[in-house]
Amino acid sequence: MKKFLIIIFGLVLTINAQSKVGSTAAPFLNIGIGPRAIAMGTAFVATSDDITALYWNPAGITRIGGNSAMFNKTSWIADINYNWAGAAVQLGDLGTIGLSVNQLDYGKMAVTTNAEQDGTGEYFSAQDIAIGLTYAYQLTDRFSIGGTAKYIQQKIYNSSASALAVDIGVLFNSDL
């Protein structure tokens, strides 16, 4: 019994130790897409049935009801622009494929140093981008499954970082 309690205690400690690891990587991926989803307070994963399902739940693109595309540009403060584009094509009994691109462009910024705080005359830019390829399949009239493979890149001045990610989603329509 004592060994069992020690093992449980050790497992609980390791769960808490990882709670904030990586919590700041690619935060631009948390910016929601689509007016309907945003109006619902981003509670859209279970109801995703339009082209924005490429962002919210890849399984949802099976519910679009045809081929679809959407382009979105949001101008934020300080010349920051957020762009999103997505397209999905239904392949009949083979499923549905989609492509999406998220881009956050911070615009041009002046290079400053401790000695030249008003700027050196040089400018640099920063940009985040994610490109996703999605496949979804409707297993039954109520149940769909889908996945997205993403390439993510963040650039600022002369530095960049990139990663690969996978999103997997299921969608069950209960008709309630």
Residue map of PLM features:
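Sec-dependent N-terminal signal peptides
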Residues: 4-15
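Subset of outer-membrane beta-barrel
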Residues: 18-176
